[in-house]
Amino acid sequence: MPENLQLVIITGMSGAGKTVAVQSFEDMGYFCIDNLPPSLIPKFWELIKESGKVTKIALVIDLRSRTFFREIQDMLVELENTNFIDTTILFLDATDEELVSRYKETRRAHPMAMDGLVTEGIRKERAMLEEIKADAQLVIDTTDLSPRQLRERLNKELATRETHEFRVEMVSFGFKYGLPIDADIVMDVRFLPNPHYIDELRPLTGMDQPVYDYVMGFPETDEFYTKFIDLLRTVLPGYKKEGKSSVTIAIGCTGGQHRSVALTERVGAELKEEDYHVNITHRDRLKRKETVNRS
């Protein structure tokens, strides 16, 4: 039996990118099987044991059936006592609006839209997958990711898991554009003074020094920052202890241009100083400029 087997179970919303994920895992040297019923996994495992050659496995499994969900849970308990010592459930998600857009673009029927309404199919599927999403070690929101960006994200995630490195994903966002659906921790900083109402600061972002200094120049900002960092010093070790390879922290303001960007930069810098591996993404930082340019 090969040692250090890595098993990735790929699931998630229809249209969220599972096909791209499978292609990415194949490129990374994984043995991939698409839509294997959970009831056949024990037999598949026996074949893997007999071969002794496969060390990386990725399975795409349809978990819309509650029976399938129970089977996969039982299977994972069994695998905890085997050499599949690194089992990861990867859940791919996207906003309902983005999923509808993708289905319209491809003109495909949603597998759960019995009456032809894509929105109803998405609603049913999301409800059925709620449990497995909660149990997933890795949730990726593909709403704003191109296929190439999804491949890059998966490469990064898998590299982290293989080296057992704990990573913190910092994301700034604007509430007007929706919550990041893969966030583990969401913080609302709309209570802080808004640079948007200062004429010379309005066109800038939280990465520009004048905006950064403005946001950080208030006592309430210092108080919030100190308490939030203290909170993270408590919860991040807990996430790591529970076996998570990464945690996504989302900080939001109204438009995702000023306050959230500045705070995300500051919190990210502090966590780097404390030896966390940190990636920073400003999801909506330039969206206002893009809107102005299109109008």
UniProtKB/Swiss-Prot annotation:
Binding positions (ATP): 12-19
UniProt name for this protein: Nucleotide-binding protein EF_0766
Gene3D superfamilies assigned to the protein according to its UniProt record, in alphabetical order: P-loop containing nucleotide triphosphate hydrolases
Positions that bind GTP: 62-65
Cited function: Displays ATPase and GTPase activities.
Residue stretches spanning the membrane: none
Keywords per UniProt: ATP-binding, GTP-binding, Nucleotide-binding
MF terms (GO), sorted A to Z: ATP binding; GTP binding
Family classification: Belongs to the RapZ-like family.
SUPFAM superfamilies tied to this protein: P-loop containing nucleoside triphosphate hydrolases
Species: Enterococcus faecalis (strain ATCC 700802 / V583)
InterPro entries attached to this UniProt entry: P-loop_NTPase (IPR027417), RapZ-like (IPR005337), RapZ-like_N (IPR053930), RapZ_C (IPR053931)
